[in-house]
Every structure is written in C-alpha cells, then in structure tokens.
C-alpha cells in the first residue's frame, strides 16, 4: 500500500484527487500514509490544512489520553512530526516508535518512572512509547523553564546541543535575541524545521 500511495500521490493532477486520496487513507486508518500524501502534496503547492493534521484513530487517541505526561495536543504534534503516527517506525539513527525515542534515552527514562525497559515495546506497545516519550519531553520542558521551542529542539537534537547553542547564539528567554531568530540559527536543518 505504501508503494502504491507514493506512486499515486506523485501522479495526482488535481487538488480534488489529492483530497480524495488523503480522505480515503484517513478513513482506512492509514494515518501515516495520509500524512505522507499531504506532505508530498505541499511540494506541488497543494495545501489542505484540515487534512495535513489528522487526529489518529480513536483507540490510539485514547492511548495518548491515558498515558501522556504532557498536554495531549503536544504529544500528538510530536508524534505526527516524529513518526506520522507509525507505531513501528524506526529511524536511520535508531529512534523507535510513535515518539521516536532513542533506546538509551528510553532506558534512562524508564528507570526514572519505575518502568522496566523493554526495547521491543518501543515499537510494539504505543502506551509504553507514549509514556516514555511524553515524560522525556516533560523533562526537557522543565529543564528549559517552560520554553516549548527549546524543549522541542532538545527533544529532537538533545539537551546538550541546545545548551551549547544557547551559549553560542544567546538565550531568547533572557532577551538576548528573539525566539524566531534563535530558531533560525539552529545549525541542524532537521531540528530547525522540527521546531
């Protein structure tokens, strides 16, 4: 289905066709493919906001509600960006699951919340991944005094890098520069776009 969707989205000629495909994928609970299709459509100047940010199926949404340590909209936004709601996603760097946790980070976080670390559960059990990922983001938010921009950058690139960037470029929380300028100075394009 993934290959078929990729071929189909690249061959779409009208906005109407694109909307039909994305709606169909959402109805089939193929959220990650719907997000992929909507991202590809943007490259062709087809932007449909209400389709670009789908809410996952009810069962998964309930899992977020029951397991998140952070506001659900934040956990959903992180998961959409990190994995497009693909619970089995594994990045080239080795990050795993819905919230794309690196195994080492997951192990440390599991210990902090008195959970047994089980690597395979990062991709097999959404509740496990959401619990660990949301707790880790909560820690980043606390570490950077409630700054979502800094916490998101730390979640994606690591807190040590963010601390280095604060020393190098200045701290938007202190008024050294505005937040948008700080974000634009992030040297890793993936993290800059992520934030």
Give the ranges of each region predicted by the language model:
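Catalytic glycan-binding domains that act on GlcNAc-containing polysaccharides
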Residues: 2-195
């Amino acid at each position: 289905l993934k290959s078929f969707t990729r071929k189909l989205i690249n061959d779409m000629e009208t906005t109407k066709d694109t909307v039909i495909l994305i709606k169909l994928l959402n109805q089939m609970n193929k959220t990650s493919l719907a997000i992929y299709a909507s991202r590809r459509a943007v490259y062709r100047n087809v932007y449909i906001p209400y389709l670009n940010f789908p809410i996952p199926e009810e069962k998964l949404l309930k899992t977020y509600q029951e397991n998140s340590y952070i506001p659900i909209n934040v956990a959903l936004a992180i998961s959409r960006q990190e994995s497009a709601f693909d619970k089995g996603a594994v990045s080239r760097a080795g990050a795993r699951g819905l919230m794309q946790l690196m195994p080492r980070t997951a192990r440390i976080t599991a210990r902090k919340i008195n959970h047994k670390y089980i690597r395979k559960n990062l991709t097999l059990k959404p509740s496990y991944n959401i619990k660990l990922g949301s707790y880790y983001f909560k820690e980043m938010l606390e570490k950077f005094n409630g700054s979502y921009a800094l916490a998101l950058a730390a979640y994606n690139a690591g807190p040590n890098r963010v601390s280095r960037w604060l020393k190098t470029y200045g701290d938007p929380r202190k008024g050294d520069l505005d937040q948008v300028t700080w974000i634009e100075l992030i040297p890793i394009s993936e993290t800059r776009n992520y934030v």
